Structures are given as C-alpha cells and as structure tokens.
Amino acid sequence: MAVSKEDILETISNMTVMEIVDLISAMEEKFGVSAAAAVAVAPVAAGAAAPAVEEKTEFDVVMTSFGANKVNVIKAIREITGLGLKEAKDLVEGVPSTVKEGISKAEADDIKKKLEEAGAAVDVK
C-alpha cells in the first residue's frame, strides 16, 4: 500500500520539533544529502528576484543650489538639522550637499518643501 503525500504531511504536522529534527537527520543519512544545502539555495533564488520588486524606503535630501536668499536657506538648514551657524553655512555653500540621509519619504518631502520655501533647489534621491 502506497502512502500519499497528504498522509506524510499530516503525520509530520503532528510531530514535535525534536521528532522532526530526528526525521531530517535520518533522511540525510539514508539519502546521502544535506538539508542545509537545499535551504541555502532557496534564498538565493528568491533574493535574485526581490530587488526588481523592492520599493525604496529610505531617501536622501540633496540641496543642489541655495538660490538668491542664502540667509533664509541657512536658517532652514539649522532648523532641520540642528547644526550650528558655521556648519549650516558651510553645508549651504558646499552645494551640492546632502542635507539628510536615510529618511522616510514623508520626512524627505517635508524637508524639501521647507528648503524650497526658503529659496533652495532640492532633490530627493
């Protein structure tokens, strides 16, 4: 009498974790294979397709120009980053410069809006 896959799966689902570990060890010995090799291959195949589907979750705000009103842009940079006057001035004058890195889309859009209102040209990457 042949045992169906459903019967095997039902039996395994009723086993404890230790019994399953023993079963896997016995199968490795009987068939001369390693379960670790099969597990290591599966994530590689899944990982190869994942980057095409992944959505970007972290964004960088990059100021490309400070425009005509540098003082207002420096004030906005100080408010956003908490930098001192000299550091904020150096950041503004060193365009293109990264204002913030690894932030959410909403926060990046908020910072972009504040800087554009102050007169800066900003990209979210």
Swiss-Prot record:
Gene3D superfamilies: 3.30.1390.10, Single helix bin. The gene is rplL. CDD domains: Ribosomal_L7_L12. One of its GO terms (biological process) is translation. InterPro entries: Ribosomal_bL12, Ribosomal_bL12_C, Ribosomal_bL12_C/ClpS-like, Ribosomal_bL12_oligo, Ribosomal_bL12_oligo_N_sf. GO terms for molecular function: mRNA binding; structural constituent of ribosome. One of its GO terms (cellular component) is cytosolic large ribosomal subunit. Homodimer. Part of the ribosomal stalk of the 50S ribosomal subunit. Forms a multimeric L10(L12)X complex, where L10 forms an elongated spine to which 2 to 4 L12 dimers bind in a sequential fashion. Binds GTP-bound translation factors. Pfam families: Ribosomal_L12 (PF00542), Ribosomal_L12_N (PF16320). Keywords: Ribonucleoprotein, Ribosomal protein. Belongs to the bacterial ribosomal protein bL12 family. Forms part of the ribosomal stalk which helps the ribosome interact with GTP-bound translation factors. Is thus essential for accurate translation. This is Large ribosomal subunit protein bL12. The lineage of its organism: Bacteria, Pseudomonadati, Pseudomonadota, Gammaproteobacteria, Methylococcales. It comes from the Bacteria.
